[in-house]
Each structure stands twice: as C-alpha cells, then as structure tokens.
From Swiss-Prot:
Binds directly to 23S rRNA. The L1 stalk is quite mobile in the ribosome, and is involved in E site tRNA release. Protein L1 is also a translational repressor protein, it controls the translation of the L11 operon by binding to its mRNA. Gene3D superfamilies: 3.30.190.20, 3.40.50.790. The lineage of its organism: Bacteria, Bacillati, Bacillota, Clostridia, Thermoanaerobacterales. HAMAP family: Ribosomal_uL1_B. It comes from Thermoanaerobacter sp. (strain X514). Keywords: Repressor, Ribonucleoprotein, Ribosomal protein, RNA-binding, rRNA-binding, Translation regulation, tRNA-binding. Transmembrane segments: none annotated. InterPro entries: Ribosom_uL1_bac-type, Ribosomal_uL1, Ribosomal_uL1-like, Ribosomal_uL1/biogenesis, Ribosomal_uL1_3-a/b-sand, Ribosomal_uL1_CS. Belongs to the universal ribosomal protein uL1 family. Pfam families: Ribosomal_L1. GO terms for cellular component: large ribosomal subunit. This is Large ribosomal subunit protein uL1. Part of the 50S ribosomal subunit.
Length: 230
C-alpha cells in the first residue's frame, strides 16, 4: 500500500518499535495527525483471550468523560408513552413496525445506535440478520434494551460507547477528536482502559492486555506500554 508524504513524515517523529507511556503516546499521536480535517483518535487493544469461547468474550459500555466528538443519531423502537418519553429525551427517530419495514425495504441506516423497550424485541428480532452484522442490534448487556429510555438516550448522546472484542482478539474504539487536546484524550483513553481491564473474564489466562496502540485516522500507530497506562 502506497503511503502519503504526510504519513511518511510522521514516522520520523518517533520510534515505531518503542512502547511509550500513555501521556507520551497521545503527544506523539497529536503531532502525527497532519490531515486537513479533525481526525478521530482511535484505540486498538489486543487481549489475551480466545473469543471463540463464550466465557472469554469481552464486551461492555463506558461513558467517555468528554464524549466522542461526533453527534450520535439514536433510533428507538417504542410505543405509546414510551415513544413520547424517547422523543422528549432527544431520540432522532422513534417508531415501531413501520421502522422495521423501512429498514427491511429501504436498507436504511441513518443512525448510529438502536435502543428498544423489552416489549418491542419480538418486533425488532426480525431485523437480527440486518442489524446484527453491523453491531446495531439492541442488547440488554449494553443497556440498549430497557424501559428507562430517558437514561439510555441521554447517556448515549453524552458519549457512551460500546466495546467488544473481535474475532482476532482486538477491541477497536474511538476516544475522541484531535481538537480535544491532550488532557481530554488522556482522560477518555484511561476511562476506556479502566473499563476493559475491569471486564477481564475469569477464564482468561496469562497476560490479559497484550498490546495497546493509539492512532489518528490518517496517522501511524503508536504503541503504549501496558504498564504505563495510568
């Protein structure tokens, strides 16, 4: 893959083989984020788990202290009073069967998170094959199947994100934008790492945090020393 001039220049700013403290790593990532737009800062954490085993799955949610920097569109499946509650709490789209039909017929994905009341899951279940692969299916573990719609919507809008380990044993999450600056990014980074560490499955053996890498949208990866996160 051909790399751009800015990317290659960025590589000269640090030692790609070295592991840095979280403080130093964020400094470097900000220096290497040279694109002409407000780049997202991404975190990739490789875990010492085997995701093929149900007892070694790692997933959860965390509210980023400073949000993600992007406005999140929330779709809510609810009826009656609960639909009114969702609208009042700031949901972008609220509906029931008619939204299921829209998603099935129009391949409609103009939203980032889907929330549903438990009584609607029979209806939403029809969308499993469509929403599932995109990670959009409501789930009680991530707090997106709930009757407390106001709390769920407000947390999501405030910067609540879901993390889950992929087939390769890696968690990928955004921790904010370049424009946040070092302190806010550091606080978001540490909030995510704290949540991932607390999610360690009892069945996971050996070293849990194998590697931690920070990068901007267009920039190179910077390694963080797992012993120098906090």
């Amino acid at each position: 893959m051909k790399r751009g001039k800015k990317y290659l220049e960025s590589l000269k700013l640090y030692d790609k083989t070295q592991q840095y403290s979280s403080d130093e790593a964020i400094d470097i990532v900000l220096k290497t984020a040279k694109a002409n737009f407000d780049e997202t800062i991404d975190l990739a954490v490789r875990l010492g788990v085997d995701p093929r085993h149900a007892d070694q799955q790692v997933r959860g949610t965390v509210v980023l202290p400073h949000g993600t920097g992007k406005s999140v569109k929330v779709l809510v499946f609810a009826k009656g009073e609960k639909a009114k509650e969702a609208e009042a709490a700031g949901a972008d789209y609220v509906g029931a069967e008619e939204l299921v039909a829209k998603i099935q017929n129009e391949n409609w994905f103009d939203y980032d998170v889907v929330v549903a009341t438990p009584d609607m899951m029979g209806v939403v279940g029809r969308l499993g094959k469509i929403l599932g692969p995109k990670g959009l299916m409501p789930n009680p573990k991530s707090g997106t199947v709930t009757f407390d719609l106001e709390k769920a919507i407000k947390e999501i809008k405030a910067g609540k994100i879901e993390y889950r380990v992929d087939k390769a044993g890696i968690i990928h999450v955004p921790i904010g934008k370049k424009s946040f600056g070092k302190e806010k990014l550091l606080e978001n980074f540490r909030a995510v790492m704290d949540a991932i560490i607390k999610s360690k499955p009892a069945a996971a053996k050996g070293q849990y945090i194998k590697s931690v890498v920070l990068s901007s949208t267009m920039g190179p990866g910077v390694k963080v020393n797992p012993l120098k996160i906090f």
